[in-house]
């Protein structure tokens, strides 16, 4: 199998690329930085410039599956300009990919797999969200993810086997949630966000990478939640980190009002609760390497003693 990856230099994209090479797949990847183009027998980089509508059509040669992971970081300072960029950085690349496929006349592309986020679901402390949930976007993130998914699904006109993965909280030794919690823990403090009762639907970096490859290989259609089977409340998550990291820290409750004062509209990313089901991906046949957060954290802290 030969895969084309967008966003290959990001946290998830890099993990997908490495996992694909371990499985002996051939990989092409797109980058807007010419200095990051490297070529080998099994892995080749190609240049694209979304803003100037340019893509190297050679990137499509022999490709069976496209994995789309490109997009600007969401948790940044929100302005009218940055909000526009967060959305356009997810919409424009898909448009360019579709144009490129048409120009290339490549007929071997059988599957398109695109990232999405569980942030599309409403804040709720009781529901267990499935992919069948009616989507009624209210806030900026929900609206952005909704438009992202709509654009991804438009690829079905060219590639009928189009899938979307709604990704949860990614646990990695390199970046993301664990790195963000690391700084206060160095000073003996763990931060409970608001009530701490909000559900956190997480996934180990190895599992999210392997789910993308699993979907690429099995070639289904539709939307799948990419989360581990056992989510947990944020305050319990902190306690699990304390045990698995072998680090002593005091848990401090940071009230919602303070978070809203410092982060403004972005605070709901930290405070909202989404308990998300992995039943559909399990029924498809994916076997999680890390079903319990204890297993995931033990693995990550073992892999990098400097994580916290």
Over which residues does each language-model region extend?
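Conserved Rossmann-fold NAD(P)-dependent oxidoreductase catalytic core, especially the SDR/UDP-sugar
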Residues: 95-137
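Alpha-helical substrate-binding/gating segment
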Residues: 182-190, 197-232
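NAD(P)-dependent short-chain dehydrogenase/reductase
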Residues: 139, 146, 153-156, 161-164, ...
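Non-catalytic, hydrophobic alpha-helical segments
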Residues: 66, 208, 212, 226, ...
């Amino acid at each position: 199998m030969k895969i084309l990856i967008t966003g290959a230099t990001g946290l998830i994209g890099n993990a997908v690329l490495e996992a694909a090479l371990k499985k002996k797949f051939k990989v092409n990847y797109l980058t807007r930085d010419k200095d990051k183009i490297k070529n080998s027998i099994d892995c080749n980089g190609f240049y694209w410039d979304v803003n100037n509508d340019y893509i190297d059509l050679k990137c499509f040669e022999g490709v069976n599956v496209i994995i789309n992971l490109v997009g600007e970081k969401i948790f940044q300072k929100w302005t009218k300009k940055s909000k526009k960029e967060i959305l356009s950085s997810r919409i424009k690349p898909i448009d360019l990919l579709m144009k490129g496929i048409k120009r290339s006349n490549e007929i071997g592309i059988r599957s398109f797999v695109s990232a999405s986020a569980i942030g599309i679901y409403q804040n709720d402390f009781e529901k267990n969200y499935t992919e069948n949930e009616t989507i009624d976007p209210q806030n900026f993130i929900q609206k952005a993810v909704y438009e992202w998914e709509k654009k991804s699904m438009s690829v079905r006109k060219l590639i009928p086997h189009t899938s979307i993965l709604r990704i949860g909280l990614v646990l990695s030794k390199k970046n993301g949630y664990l790195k963000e919690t690391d700084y206060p823990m160095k000073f003996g403090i763990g931060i409970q966000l608001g009530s701490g009762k909000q559900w956190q639907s997480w996934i180990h970096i190895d599992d999210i990478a392997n789910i993308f490859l699993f979907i690429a290989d099995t070639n289904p259609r539709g939307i799948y939640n990419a989360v581990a089977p056992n989510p947990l409340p944020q305050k319990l998550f902190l306690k699990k980190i304390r045990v698995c990291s072998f680090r002593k820290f005091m848990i401090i409750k940071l009230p919602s009002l303070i978070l809203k004062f410092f982060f403004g509209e972005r605070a709901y990313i930290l405070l909202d609760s989404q308990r998300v089901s992995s039943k559909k991906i399990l029924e498809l046949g994916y076997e999680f390497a890390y079903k319990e957060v204890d297993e995931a954290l033990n693995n990550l802290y073992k892999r990098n003693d400097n994580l916290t």
